[in-house]
Amino acid sequence: QLNIIEDPDTAPAGTRFVQFQNEQPGRGCRALQGFAVDGRKIGILRLSFFVRGKNIRYGLQRDQWPQVIVTFYNHDRQAISNEKVGPFFGNFAWRQEKARLAVPLQAREAILRIGLLGATGEISFDQIELSGEAS
């Protein structure tokens, strides 16, 4: 389940944050955002976000952990690579994560994926930012 929480006292940036909750192992609790990215022009994506976790455990399989995943696609919309930040597990307070993700030369589009991704517990995200660096 996805919730938008409005709480300026606990949101690390602004007044709202997104929260995912799931009690059913293996359930795909997530949000996606697609965007154009040309690997001939952009070599690196800078990603930053705030994340908080409560009682996070893997899902039906040990690779079902919450993480932030960017999947890159070529001009035929075939997946060519994944870049990941995480996984996240257990309990932890708000913290900022930053990463530099390599953009494949063949990339023309990408999808950013966040959520529990099959895991159980609760994970929250705030102030997700992406910016590109020229090749």
Regions picked out by a protein language model, each given a short descriptive name:
Residues 1-135:
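Extracellular and organelle-lumenal recognition/adhesion modules and their flexible linkers in secreted
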